[in-house]
């Protein structure tokens, strides 16, 4: 895997990407996404906050400590969702090799499951089983809801969604981190994986949202005036 790096203001062009729940307390909510089936949701405020904390921490940590399964932008999101919902036992922490002590509570209303955790909607059929895999387009269509075209509306853990019709794999996602526990220099960090291209497997990158708005290629600026920036989306797992 290419070495992860913190991206300065003069950014290189972003890469492209290919892009039985056992516990009763996990409830479902309809109508959060147009044409989407019933959605998983953590309605408990404490669990929602715990999930968001873990999700942001794990996505951010993947920049500093590469994860084998994270090979594109959607894989980063799947990894962070899945591992946020696990019990974070001493053995889990040992294997995760996080750069710091998390100090976060676990999500108590988590799905049952061991290594295999089908968590994602992949169809508009409400009876369709959940899946372990969802690409970027599927994550947005069935597992997230639109928040705003204004990137300033993003909360930690929200997704920035781009669609680049001219590319072979047009859908690309970034995760808004906000303040980073690994870098105290700003409060608007974003992380993402470029995905593979003809030059190699791609890499994790980290950049400030403010710098991204001045990206040398206008199509990657998270601005309402940029038609390739679809907007800010929020995982339906959290309110």
Descriptions of predicted regions:
Residues 5-6, 59:
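Long alpha-helical scaffolds
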Residues 8-22:
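Bacterial N-terminal signal peptides
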Residues 187-239:
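Low-complexity, Gly/Ser/Thr/Pro-rich intrinsically disordered linker/tail segments
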Residues 20-30:
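Signal peptide processing junction and immediate N-terminal pro/mature segment
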Residues 28-131:
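N-terminal capping segments
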Residues 100-199:
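...with weaker cross-activation on analogous glycine-rich loops/strands in unrelated enzymes
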